Design a protein with these regions (language model features):
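Phosphate-group recognition and catalysis centered on beta-loop-alpha active-site segments
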Residues: 1-276
Length: 276
């Protein structure tokens, strides 16, 4: 009960009686929507803060606008992360750029604008990271466009080798492979999705059917058996959103490949003590 109530407030909360961790090989620390505890999520300041922390990778979310431009935002609307309201798919880029995406978080970030994919990738070009995890949101139209444009822009910026496209929508992952068989993909799933039951029992089979390179499960699905079977099938495991120290340490013990977290600094500190 304590963990359920306070888990997101106290990331350093540790359950009693936890065993120490073995030394492990490298695990990627991937900042979830940037360092979103310190700056507004999915904005350039959040990703710049991630670089200061020294993460191995970025995770972000991409939507397509009414005029077919790619922008970074988690939700389908801008209601909770800006001073505006409305659906991204029903607005042009110029309309979206009129809104403040920083003040809701702190006056310090007043005037922060929604980043375009191009603006984000220009930052990534300067970054010493190895993982560029772009989650594609299912558009109501232009499904092919959001995938093809993402791949085109990433290639244009010379970042294709770092790219892994993830999505809850299998159609987008299949589309990515059809555009370029070398595009790495990861299937996202969580406990509250209709795919949950099949993924509990048949995650390797589903991954093979979708021809993905990685599984991106909510961390509640992950245990040592899960990771072992995924690795035996040649799949990477990047898990999310891992914030509690107890969960971070569990993921280390399980041997995941990447930890997607709101607390990259905390995760990095734990990993530095227990990896080689």
């Amino acid at each position: 009960m304590i963990r359920a109530v306070y888990g997101n407030i106290f990331p350093l909360f540790r359950l009693p009686g936890e065993r120490s961790l073995p030394k492990m090989s490298h695990i990627n620390v991937i900042s979830h929507r940037g360092a979103n505890i310190y700056a507004p999520q999915n904005t350039l300041p959040a990703f710049k803060k991630s670089l200061e922390i020294g993460v191995d990778g970025f995770e972000t979310d991409i939507h397509i606008t009414k005029d077919d431009k790619l922008v970074l935002c988690h939700n389908y609307t801008i209601d909770s992360t800006s001073d505006g309201k409305g659906s991204i798919s029903q607005m042009t880029l110029d309309q979206l750029k009129n809104y403040d995406f920083g003040s809701y978080f702190s006056p310090k970030f007043a005037g922060t604008r929604i980043p375009t994919m191009e603006e984000f990738l220009a930052l990534v070009e300067t970054a010493d990271i190895s993982v560029l995890n772009i989650e594609l949101k299912s558009p109501k139209k232009n499904e092919t466009a959001i995938v093809s444009e993402t791949i085109r822009l990433v290639k244009e910026h010379g970042l294709f080798e770092k790219l892994i496209i993830s999505s809850f929508d299998p159609k987008l992952l299949v589309e990515a492979k059809q555009i370029d068989q070398n595009c790495k993909t990861g299937f996202l799933y969580s406990l509250n999705r209709k795919t949950a039951w099949s993924m509990i029992r048949h995650y390797v089979e589903v991954a093979k059917r979708l021809q993905v390179d990685a599984l991106h499960p909510q961390n509640i699905f992950v245990n040592e058996k899960y990771v072992y079977e995924a690795h035996e099938a040649g799949l990477l495991v990047n898990t999310w959103t891992v914030n509690l120290v107890s969960d971070i340490e569990k993921m280390i013990r399980c041997g995941v490949d990447g930890i997607i977290t709101n607390y990259p600094d905390v995760t990095k500190g734990i990993l530095e003590k227990h990896t080689y």
